Design a protein with these regions (language model features):
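Hydrophobic alpha-helical segments
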Residues: 1-22, 302, 420, 434-468
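N-terminal leader/targeting segments
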Residues: 1-84, 291, 484, 499, ...
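Alpha-helical transmembrane segments of polytopic membrane proteins
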Residues: 28-39, 338, 418-425, 483-488
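Membrane-interface helix/helix-cap signal primarily in integral membrane proteins
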Residues: 67-238, 580, 630, 645-648
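Hydrophobic alpha-helical transmembrane segments in multi-pass membrane proteins
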Residues: 3, 226-414, 481-530
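Non-globular, low-confidence helical/coil segments that flank catalytic cores
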Residues: 98, 108-110, 115-122, 133-142, ...
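Hydrophobic alpha-helical segments of membrane proteins
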Residues: 207, 211, 223, 289, ...
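Low-complexity, intrinsically disordered, cysteine-poor segments enriched in small/polar
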Residues: 188-191, 195, 199-202, 373, ...
Length: 746
């Protein structure tokens, strides 16, 4: 079988992704099981009947891969992930271990990972993310003893690395550093990474050094939020996330130097392998880098033995390496994008390049004379540009479905921006590597300065390009609407249909026309149908209220409380559609309404923060909290916020209580916080369509409404259920799910 590992690897990726992202749905398991059994039956029949033994063997291998990967995901989830979650989640633990990676710091917080060896006195190998809003008196790879209240970790990128728990420094956390350090190969790599970062910080201004650190080492936490937004809006975030592209550039540069020194293919293979492993370690063994590293090592080994490695087979083998023993690796969306982009480049870049060159009747024979030489090199440059374009287009088309589904947005200008930025990124990678390494070498550190200068100039060019293009209208398009998925589905079906058509030239033209028509018609209908959209979303956050008002062009938070364990889910849900928040309103500083504020501040750009509190001292302390300016007020206040053209939020502050009356075209919602007395609320606000509460307010009999929305835990809901039923016969709770209210549609 020519591409055994290709078949197994891609099957692993497909099955594991289907199981994980369907949240272990029973229907998905039924489909996968049926597919495996059917493949086995057909494969055995073909082998026995000798009609097509080769295809029969492929079907049997496919069936094995389907069954193994599904079973592997079930076993890993049940005996690895769930064991840790069931034993330690939402409990206070006492544990020992060591900080197993670098401590990541930002302006307002720091986080680090502890790998435990004992929990509650019992041997236990678990990884726990610790989040702190103050400095931690410990060093990377230092042994520690600690006490913490742990929560389930729901961040997919961390689940992919086996980090199933998290804890917060201020939530009963105590840590005692022993001073003893653990020495491993990875700890040595982290030391080199820290030294390289210090070199870049010493050589370059902050804006440029942080970009170099992001591009070279994948550390984008230090980047300014506006810079990250610019990269996100232009769809070029992959440039500041260490990936296979970065590894290829670095390794190609090293090989260029090595080949100048030796022609021995075994030495070249050794240098290649060393460079790949070193770069993987320094960048934290990111899945996309490991994918590229495995492929590169295979190609190098094949070359040393005078063989040509099959690209798809190599890619499949890399998938097997990454997922065979860690099926949760598919939780890293970056890894899936890496595999998808690479597959697109392998399958489509050459055909696209040939088609473009054929369209321009490209022929490039060198002719004598100056003019002939100039024309030759111009045509050669044109071919290089076509090659770069074909690679970018093929990668973009293959990651488009994943990007649209995972991030709910795409950038139409990503190909143009990436083509303009990639030459600068390549130069930046090489020069920042050289200057960061040379600067820490005694006696020759002065050689780092010219490379630092080039790195700074490249950083300036990249930042200018990305910032300029991010300001263009339609630099990014939201794809959370149904028409996008219809368009993707139609396009995929048209592409599959092309495999069975003889006259492909005519079919391609018709397919492109149909695809564009579906997209344009869908977008037009979406604009007409959603122009007046406005909804209120109340999240399942346990004890407290976190509610947003979402409009087509803006998002506002009317309360941001709840259990800290739900912070990641809430911020991730909002960030799928919005990068900034127009208004954040804190009804009072009780944790039930404010505990998740710091998470929102860290994740989003906040245009207006309004805090109601009569305590003058607390008001004065707020602005020093994280540098964000807040409008604080107390007393009896009354004002209206225009959240959109069709939705308003009327704020009524009476007797130390903030009421909020949210009004859409057809629906009104009254938000009443704890300890409120409804007799203080003006009578005209006592007849909302929906009442949002987290406890039963005083004088609730004064309210007349159609529906009561209770935000709180299941225990609280059951405790207050009969009292709530007296307000309205229709009662819904966030204890099991998020609740959405259509403010303009009823």
């Amino acid at each position: 079988m020519k591409r055994l590992f290709g078949l197994i690897g891609f099957t692993f990726l497909f099955v594991l992704s289907a199981v994980f992202y369907s949240d272990f749905n029973e229907i998905v398991f039924a489909i996968i099981g049926s597919l495996g059994l059917l493949s086995v039956a057909v494969g055995i029949f073909l082998i026995i009947s000798k009609k097509n033994k080769s295809f029969g063997k492929s079907l049997c291998v496919f069936a094995f891969a389907v069954i193994y990967s599904a079973s592997n995901m079930i076993g890993y989830s049940e005996y690895v992930n769930n064991t840790v979650i069931n034993n330690y989640s939402d409990k206070e633990i006492t544990a020992s271990g060591y900080i197993c990676d670098e401590i990541i710091t930002t302006d307002s917080s720091c986080s680090f990972i502890i790998k435990t060896d004992k929990i509650n006195g019992q041997p236990s190998d678990a990884k726990i993310q610790i989040i702190s809003y103050s400095n931690v008196d410990a060093e990377p790879f230092e042994k520690v003893n600690f006490t913490a209240h742990t929560y389930k970790n729901n961040v997919n990128s961390q689940l992919s690395h086996g980090i199933f728990l998290k804890a917060y420094f201020y939530d009963g956390f105590k840590i005692d550093a022993t001073g003893e350090k653990v020495t491993t190969f990875y700890s040595f790599a982290v030391s080199i990474r820290r030294a390289m970062k210090n070199s870049l910080d010493m050589l370059l201004p902050e804006d440029y050094s942080t970009l170099c650190r992001a591009v070279l080492l994948g550390e984008k936490t230090a980047l300014d939020s506006s810079v990250k937004d610019d990269f996100s809006l232009t769809g070029t975030s992959f440039l500041i996330v260490v990936s296979g592209m970065h590894l290829v550039i670095i390794t190609s540069f090293v090989l260029f130097l090595v080949r100048k020194l030796t022609k021995n293919r075994f030495l070249i293979t050794g240098f290649t392998t060393f460079t790949v492993i070193a770069f993987m370690a320094v960048t934290g063994f990111a899945h996309s880098v490991v994918r590229a590293g495995v492929m590169m090592i295979i190609v190098s080994l094949a070359s040393s033995n005078l063989r040509i490695a099959d690209s798809l087979n190599n890619l499949g083998f890399a998938a097997v390496v990454l997922t065979a023993f860690n099926p949760y690796a598919v939780a890293d969306i970056g890894m899936l994008l890496s595999f998808s982009a690479t597959t697109g480049i392998i399958l489509w870049s050459r055909p696209i390049e040939r088609s473009v060159l054929r369209f321009f009747h490209y022929k490039n024979k060198r002719k004598d004379g100056f003019v002939g030489t100039v024309v030759y090199y111009i045509k050669r440059l044109f071919k290089i540009c076509v090659n770069m374009l074909s690679v970018s287009v093929s990668a973009f088309l293959w990651i488009l479905p994943i990007t649209a589904v995972a991030f709910n947005r795409i950038s139409p200008i990503v190909i143009l921006v990436s083509l303009l930025c990639e030459p600068f990124v390549s130069a930046l990678l090489v020069c920042s590597l050289l200057c960061s390494v040379l600067y820490i070498c005694p006696f020759i550190s002065f050689f780092a300065y010219p490379f630092g200068l080039v790195s700074g100039l490249c950083s300036k060019a990249i930042l200018w390009l990305v910032s300029t293009f991010s300001q263009l209208p339609f630099s990014t398009i939201k794809t959370h609407s149904l028409y996008w998925f219809v368009w993707i589905g139609v396009s995929i079906l048209l592409a599959i249909g092309g495999l069975f058509v003889i006259n492909r030239k005519f079919y391609v033209r018709i397919s492109v026309l149909i695809s564009i028509s579906v997209l344009v018609i869908g977008a037009s209908l979406n604009v007409l149908l959603t122009a007046d959209n406005g909804e209120m979303k109340i999240y399942n956050v346990g004890n407290g209220v976190f509610a947003t008002v979402n409009c087509p062009d803006s998002c506002s938070v009317i309360s941001c409380g709840g259990n800290r364990a739900s912070a990641d889910d809430v911020t991730a849900d909002i960030s799928e559609s919005y990068s900034d928040i127009e208004y954040m309103i804190i009804p009072n500083q009780n944790n039930k309404y404010s505990s998740l504020e710091r998470f929102a501040v860290a994740e989003f750009d906040l245009n207006n923060i309004l805090v109601y509190d009569n305590d003058i001292k607390k008001q004065n302390l707020l602005n020093a909290f994280d540098g964000n300016s807040r409008q604080t007020f107390g007393g009896n206040s009354h004002f209206t916020l225009n959240l959109s053209d069709t939705v308003t939020d009327e704020v009524i502050c009476v007797d130390n209580t903030m009421f909020q009356f949210i009004k859409g075209k057809n629906v009104t919602v009254l938000f009443v916080p704890t300890d409120a007395d409804l007799s203080n609320l003006p009578e005209k606000y006592r007849n909302p369509d929906c009442l949002l509460i987290d406890t039963v307010p005083e004088n609730f009999d004064l309210i007349s409404c159609n529906t009561v929305i209770f935000s709180g835990s299941e225990k609280q809901f059951k405790k207050n259920y009969y009292s709530i039923k007296e307000i309205s016969p229709t009662v819904i709770s966030t204890s099991e799910r998020n609740i959405t209210v259509n403010l303009n549609g009823g």
